[in-house]
Amino acid sequence: MMPAAACFPPGIAEEQLLADLRRLCWGAADILLAYGRGEQPPYGFPKALSVDEGGEGPVSAADLAVNQWLLDGLAQAYPDAGWTLLSEETAKEQLTAGEPLDAEWLWILDPLDGTKDFLQGTGEYAVHLALVHRGEAVLGVVLQPLLEDLWFGLVPEGRAWRENRAGEQQPAQLSSRQALGELVLVASRNHRDQRLEQLLEALALGDTKAIGSVGGKVATILRGETDVYISLSGKSAPKDWDMAAPEAVLKEAGGAFTHADGAPLRYNTGDVRQAGCLIASHGVSHQELCAKAAEAMGRIDPGFAV
């Protein structure tokens, strides 16, 4: 059964939008999988997987190809839609420091979340698309090409599901684990520091699973394999495009994704950094997790804004 109608800009029909998103996402999957196999990607993109080691991390030809595919696809399908398109790859040209975009409706895209994992061949990468309305993500899409999983989360009806290329759907299945010592943590392969290790020691969670990509991490929570993901900013911080789509899907699945003080995540605020101690969970023990994390961070890093 498909979810009931969601809130979209005037003139945007849910059924057609979801169909277009499916087409664009599976096209993006074809591009990434071809690059991953060293083959000629479809749609005329260059075969060479060139990599620019930028200051914010590597940017590959695959990032740029999927970015163009998604932006062009949305623009062509909806030339008169009342929304603005923003992606990780266009942010430098579009954004002015300290100023939000003048957009009631805003698409925030990450064409390749987990570029390092993609280049390393782990398969743990994702594509993120989020539709944001007045700072809140109201539609989230997370694509995991190698797993052939396409996740959707729609506000306000609180429905989240995944589907494969054949359109077969399954609802999210969050775990029922409750005691903190039983919760399974999903953590990054590449972003760990001493403060995070101290925080995890204070929380005394259960097992840990290492996965690349924020979307990939949240997908393990959606499948019930893990329960908690923690993002702790330091010299750098995740950005709007890292968090918006996974947060929307997890929230609509019945989970939670907030700051440790319980504040919700907001987007297009004039600062794309999602700084602080951010906690994503299956929701069952979220308040306890947040309270314990906030108290621990007060000892570990006094003055740190969670």
PLM features per residue range, with description:
Residues L86-E88, A130, N268:
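Solvent-exposed beta-strand sheet faces enriched in polar/charged residues
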Residues R159-W161, A166-Q169, V284-C290:
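Short helix-loop capping/hinge motifs at secondary-structure junctions, enriched
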Residues M1-L112, Q198, S285, P302-V306:
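N-terminal subdomain of lithium-sensitive/metallo-dependent phosphomonoesterases centered on the IMPase/IPPase/PAP
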Residues D52, L74-E88, E93, P156-R159, ...:
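Short, charged helix-to-loop "capping" segments that act as catalytic/coupling loops
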Residues Q173-V306:
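An extended, acidic
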Residues D63, E88, D110-D113, D117, ...:
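Acidic active-site catalytic centers that drive phospho-/nucleotidyl reactions
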Residues L32, D63, L74, T115, ...:
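Residue-level signal for inorganic ion chemistry
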Residues A97-N164:
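DPxDG-like acidic metal-binding loop motif
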